[in-house]
Structure formats: structure tokens, C-alpha cells
């Protein structure tokens, strides 16, 4: 999601190919031996295999932009996975991971209380990289998250979900 949004914001036209992860086509493995998505194959044959690297390639950014993203991709993502997908792990307490993930969300709410976006006054790289994961965290229990006392985060996430750019990247490509 964040790779698609970065490419859209950078106005880079790409051909999107939807992949059924239960039935990965040989072309995916030909482009990337890892067989994971996203994969961006440039005209010169260069392959970029990670969403964060696609964001860097498309939009650049500073180390400051990526500091909060690194925290999200590390500790928060670990808690998100064990909260939302607890059945994939042994001996996992999803409520513990929800509580631990909430600490990061509380930090985001505090930051968003100072400015409209994580990047400051405008939607930027930290916003486009972190919002998809907050959306996933919310999807695990919408009612619970919506009841939390995080007004700045709720407003930020709602603006993201209602944005034309988000709606555009959520349209499924025709196979």
C-alpha cells in the first residue's frame, strides 16, 4: 500500500499486477527470488523488493523522515502481527500485543497533537509509511480502537482513509 501511494504521489506511472499470494505466478519469482510483494522492476531491469525501498526510490526523504518509520516497522509491526494475526504464532497473547502496540499509537497521537501530520503541516513520508499499519491495527478491532482517547490520531487516520490518493490506490488492478 505504501509503495503504491509513494509512486502515485511521485507521479510515477507503473503497471500494477495483482498477485494472489496463495498462487504466486512464476513471473513473480522471475523478478524476485523472494516471491514477496511489492516488487518494482524498473525499465533498466533493476529490482526493488521492499516497500520502504520503493518509497525511498520514489520520494527520497531524510533520515528524520525514516526514524519514526523504523520504529513502526520494527517494534510496532511485531506487536501488530501478533495482535491481528495471533493464530499464526504459538503462545501469543493478542491482548498483550494490543497493549504494547498501543504505546506506539499513543506516541503518534501525542505527535499529531502538535501538527496535522507526522511530517508536520503536510502529509509526508512518515504518514504514508505508518498509516497503512495503523489502519491494519484498527481493522483487528475497529470498535475498540475508535473508542480510545486518541483524537489527533483518529482525525489523522480519517483524513488518510478519506483522501483521494488512498481511494485511488485501493482500486484493484484488472488482471
What are these regions, as identified by a protein language model?
Residues 68, 72-162:
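GST-like fold's C-terminal all-alpha helical module
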Residues 172-175:
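Long, charge-rich low-complexity segments
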